[in-house]
Amino acid sequence: MLASLIGGIFGTKNERELKRMRKIVEQINALEPTISALSDADLSAKTPEFKQRYNNGESLDKLLPEAFAVCREAAKRVMGMRHYDVQLIGGITLHEGKIAEMRTGEGKTLMGTLACYLNALSGEGVHVITVNDYLAQRDAELNRPLFEFLGLSIGTIYSMQEPAEKAAAYLADITYGTNNEFGFDYLRDNMVFSLAEKKQRGLHYAIIDEVDSILIDEARTPLIISGQSEDSSHLYTAINTIPPKLRPQKEEKVADGGHFWIDEKQRSVEMTEIGYETVEQELIQMGLLAEGESLYSATNLNLVHHVSAAIRAHVLFQRDVHYIIHDGEVVIVDEHTGRTMPGRRWSEGLHQAVEAKEGLAIQPENQTLATTTFQNYFRPYKKLSGMTGTADTEAAEMKEIYGLDVVIIPTHRPMIRNDQNDLIYLNRNGKYNAIIQEIMNIRQQGVAPILIGTATIEASEILSSKLKQAGIHHEVLNAKQHEREADIIAQAGSPNAVTIATNMAGRGTDIILGGNWKAKLAKLENPTPEDEARLKAQWEQDHEDVLQAGGLHIIGSERHESRRIDNQLRGRAGRQGDPGVSRFYLSLEDDLMRIFAGDRVVAMMRAMGLKEDEAIEHKMVSRSIENAQRKVEARNFDIRKNLLKYDDVNNEQRKIIYSQRDEILAENTLQEYVEEMHREVMQAMIANFIPPESIHDQWDVEGLENALRIDLGIELPVQEWLEQDRRLDEEGLVERISDEVIARYRQRRAQMGDESAAMLERHFVLNSLDRHWKDHLAAMDYLRQGIHLRGYAQKNPEQEYKKESFNLFVNMLGVIKTDVVTDLVTDLSRVHIPTPEELAEMEAQQQQQAEAMKLSFEHDDVDGLTGEVTASQEALNESATEQQTFPVPESRNAPCPCGSGLKYKQCHGKI
């Protein structure tokens, strides 16, 4: 109430932003006559002039009016398109690092050229990020003539690209590509063995197309580079026989002999006591569990992992809803777009369990070698912006997570689409029959095209079957027909066209009323001017007929969990002031209604005695549905926020490791760095046998001599030194042993020569760093999976995760140092001196291995069975405590316990 009153007096924040930007638009428009009078050569020459002015200290904000005017004039001449004023507002929004919400068909692609041009003047590169390769290639080729006319280079990145071509694409002024490829290149760049092999040149400025899809829908999908782990396919096959023998418990707190309880809101499964006992007996009969042993003993946690995955695969994942079978493989279906996602695999053994369930060949599980999330990939950009047709419903999340404001850009022409109220039916069959009847009614009234949005492949195929029975020609666009996606969407606005699309497959391609005559022309082998004129004339007639019939009719067969996805479907109609109609058809059996809408609504509708073919249209029901969607959106936001809290911990460690890697690659020699490692490792080793501040009687000198001989291959007469010099204390001993070890290292290093020694040092340091970082990522995965159980002990899981992960990280740093020193000392003393050619070959082999690593996306959308990793995690934590070599202060900014006077993060907290 108060907010609306204040908004009425002062205007909303969005209105104030638009008012400010319109003043800048007036400046741009005032320059148009002057810029239009320039010759092509003079117009192109403006780009080097702007670059020079920028290098002389003029800001991009100051250059904006003139640069936008130049870009608009160039677009008029090269592309035959002039930016509208609302597109100029959108361009300003993007330049200022905000999200521009612009309705479908209003020209987001053209709008993006303005901010691209202005920010490319800095010479630091602009990344334009899209959701798929098709859109990246399309937009790059569409805008290439404009940017090349203005003297800017343009590149496109894609998977399996030649390294030289990809490096050139990143060096271009403007680089197009998918979010996946940009993210994977970031990870690959941090696995290279020389700086010359890096492709990306820094994260300066990014424009994300369909920003809501990438930053919201994809936020929970980590990017992972992985290698295969041990094969356990036989276990998946054996345990796959257990879930069919189990039955669900009907109510969570009412024991009825069920073996597990399904929480559909949380999308998780929890076993009951009877379930545990039954599974244990089955495993005993299979010979996988010893008689009398507990399933949850520390030695059997691998079985828990497999049982958990098998039950989830059978209970929570349905074929043609969550995945399809294609060429003998399980292919995940994106719940937000309905597109298949080849190459992506569910994590924690779930994908293998689904393969076992479907009787397919089971692919080995993967071990993570490098990982990040889109949240943590995009946040380091100096400036980030985005454009979409639907972001306002997620504005709070965009602001809180990414610091991005959403500006709603007004339409060029008024929006006249007729959004009708939802119709709610008793069951799905009644709903589907009503949809078919509505399609027949529309067909009888005129030639209006119809787009039917479904939530699942299954629903699209049911409707397709009913349309066939009714004799209605139609096209189906779902995960099984994705190859024809662009063609189907291009003609979905043709007269009498009926198109079924799963969620918003085809997003990014406008549906033009009357069809797309240019797409038809492109299909002809040798089109003549007569063909072009004929197709264009036919389109003009079809376009007018469709307008007279009321434009595109949108029929939603189900409400999505997110209002944003529903708005995307509605947004396909009513583009650029065209007419259109939209309506959703729902049933009490829809997942959203059944799980979230509330018993009161369902009870009321059943009490009304509705028949299958009768519908209800009531404000209370519509409000209840919207409230249900808000609840789901809030829950998903909390999940993403929680994921970010944990991944922020990983991200800080990742940044330290990657920064250290860059330093190692940049140094010509690591001698000083390695010698400091020697001293730290010697200090830690000696402390194990000669405790700090202890008396001589407590010293284990013999053990120290044995450790030096066995671990480092060095014979040192420590006992003899002590007998010769009674004043030799612990500190002096550390210094003397370190000096001896380093002296031998220097001697051997001199024999090798500086160049060979430097290459070998870099090889050992990077090899150890990468190997232990990989193991650390696996340990962090285990920690993450079981940390929620600390809540039962009245501990804060988030704080516990920070503490435990820090201990693991510090332990890893100590182990890396020990490994490097051990490898260098033993290899430098025992093996022949490698030639520069051999070392170069060694590095080449490492790079080939890195390039061969499997890229994958892991999905974490479904929670595991409660408590499945407790014991293994406790064992892991104990192991970390036992192996820790350096004291750990509570804060990384605290003074280092070694007494150096440096902060811990700059001393022993640094590799």
From Swiss-Prot:
Organism listed in the record: Acinetobacter baumannii (strain SDF)
Pfam families to which the protein is assigned, alphabetical: P-loop_SecA, SEC-C, SecA_DEAD, SecA_PP_bind, SecA_SW
Keywords: ATP-binding, Cell inner membrane, Cell membrane, Cytoplasm, Membrane, Metal-binding, Nucleotide-binding, Protein transport, Translocase, Translocation, Transport, Zinc
GO cellular component terms attached to this protein's record: cell envelope Sec protein transport complex; cytosol; plasma membrane
Gene name of the encoded protein: secA
Superkingdom of the organism of origin: Bacteria
Protein's name according to its UniProt entry: Protein translocase subunit SecA
Cofactor note: May bind 1 zinc ion per subunit.
Function statement: Part of the Sec protein translocase complex. Interacts with the SecYEG preprotein conducting channel. Has a central role in coupling the hydrolysis of ATP to the transfer of proteins into and across the cell membrane, serving both as a receptor for the preprotein-SecB complex and as an ATP-driven molecular motor driving the stepwise translocation of polypeptide chains across the membrane.
Positions contributing to ATP binding: Q87, G105, E106, G107, K108, T109, D510
Subunit structure: Monomer and homodimer. Part of the essential Sec protein translocation apparatus which comprises SecA, SecYEG and auxiliary proteins SecDF-YajC and YidC.
Cofactor(s) recorded in Swiss-Prot or TrEMBL: Zn(2+)
Main location: membrane
BP GO annotations: intracellular protein transmembrane transport; protein import; protein targeting; protein transport by the Sec complex
Compartments, as annotated in UniProt: Cell inner membrane; Cytoplasm
Upper classification of the organism: Bacteria, Pseudomonadati, Pseudomonadota, Gammaproteobacteria, Moraxellales
Membrane topology: Peripheral membrane protein
Stored CDD domains: DEXDc_SecA, SF2_C_secA
Record-listed Zn(2+) binding positions: C896, C898, C907, H908
PROSITE patterns: SECA, SECA_MOTOR_DEAD
Catalytic activity entry: ATP + H2O + cellular proteinSide 1 = ADP + phosphate + cellular proteinSide 2
